[in-house]
Amino acid sequence: MSSPRHVFYISDRTGLTAENIGEALLNQFGNLSFKRHTHPFVDTPEKARAVVEKVNRSRQENGQRPIAFVSVVDDEIRRIIKGADAFQINFFETFLGLLEKELNTEATASGQGHHSIGNTKRYDARMEAVNFSLNHDDGVSDKNLQEADVILMGVSRSGKTPTCLYLALQYGIRAANYPLIPDDLESADLPRMVKPYRDKLFGLTIQPERLQAIRQERRPNSTYAKIDTCRSEVADAQSMFRRHGIPFANTTDKSVEELAVHILQACKLKRRF
């Protein structure tokens, strides 16, 4: 079996743009393996040269030409990185010229990346949403729950917390979540805490076999992790969702990104940035 191809994400900011687009492209090659290296804040010629050395060293040691996804605004730094012995996809170089031509004007660098804290409204909205999600994780508090944009419901380990945090970080959505415990599942009614907010509820379900595997890692050989327990809880949760007309989605084969977009569309939520 051949060794994994080395992939470098190089950015003059956080690296999130290079990673997100790069990963979306690499995911189309599920039969290949990759070893990833992320280099954020490459914003000086010295840092750029250091990264070039690492890329070239990887080429020599691995024997395969690395792949580099580059998100760098500065022309000089881009020129230095271009000297690396790698197959390079430079997002600004590839798309900026096309956009300038279409808009019939030259781009003017703002000096701040789109992840910069300089955009205070965006930053504040993100932090408020994250704090809200953390304060309303796992049904710990109903204080100000009426301010939630959406309340996720599901059995333990069905993916509620990561989905809430992704909605908060990526879209500024105030997402709370409530764990369905056996007492809730035995009742014909909605849990008391979330009942007043019926219109904000969205359910998460999961295949029992996948749930059992996740729970087994958390609490090995416990009743909580038994397949019969998982099957019963999942079936009861889905019955509750259907009984009360609560929309729900299966998290088994969905990434958190896909799940978040599905929830936005299903609940007609308006992103804050």
Swiss-Prot record:
ADP binds at G154, V155, S156, R157, S158, G159, K160, T161. Its EC number is 2.7.11.33, 2.7.4.28. The keyword Flavoprotein does not apply. InterPro entries: Kinase-pyrophosphorylase, PSRP. GO terms for molecular function: ADP binding; ATP binding; phosphotransferase activity, phosphate group as acceptor; protein serine/threonine kinase activity. Pfam families: Kinase-PPPase. Keywords: Kinase, Nucleotide-binding, Serine/threonine-protein kinase, Transferase. It comes from the Bacteria. It is an enzyme of class 2 (transferase). It catalyses: [pyruvate, water dikinase] + ADP = [pyruvate, water dikinase]-phosphate + AMP + H(+); [pyruvate, water dikinase]-phosphate + phosphate + H(+) = [pyruvate, water dikinase] + diphosphate. The keyword Transit peptide does not apply. Bifunctional serine/threonine kinase and phosphorylase involved in the regulation of the phosphoenolpyruvate synthase (PEPS) by catalyzing its phosphorylation/dephosphorylation. Belongs to the pyruvate, phosphate/water dikinase regulatory protein family. PSRP subfamily. PANTHER family: PYRUVATE, PHOSPHATE DIKINASE REGULATORY PROTEIN 1, CHLOROPLASTIC. This is Putative phosphoenolpyruvate synthase regulatory protein. It comes from Neisseria meningitidis serogroup B (strain ATCC BAA-335 / MC58). The lineage of its organism: Bacteria, Pseudomonadati, Pseudomonadota, Betaproteobacteria, Neisseriales.
